[in-house]
Amino acid sequence: MASANQIILTPSLVARVGQHIRTVMGNASSVEAAALCALNGKCVWASDAAFENAAPTIAQIGIMSLRLWVKVRSGKLDRIGLVTAEGAVDIIFVPPIASVLVVSGRDAESSWLDDEPAGLLRALGMPVKG
């Protein structure tokens, strides 16, 4: 059940999300793959088939971590970064569309992510808060 502030992930909306992500990936050479997952962990869009299989597990880790953070701390946490020997994975919560953006790259810092999820919301024509 979506709250009044959440938008349903329709095929049209998912296609627009994919278009935005592909555009910014084209300008960020360090980003190798990206996916959008619903809060139930289901992958609704992925930049490639291999990441489509991996992203739901990564998203679930992020979702569980965000829930744990909310339970034990005050304040807001909207993203998590996982660093491995081969690169980094960023997990970004996108509340208005009840989703998690999962991005894999070679650098621990992916500069286009600094503007996410605000850039994604602007691309969808949605208001950006804060």
Briefly describe each language-model feature range.
Residues M1-L39, C43-G130:
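Non-catalytic interaction/Regulatory regions outside core domains
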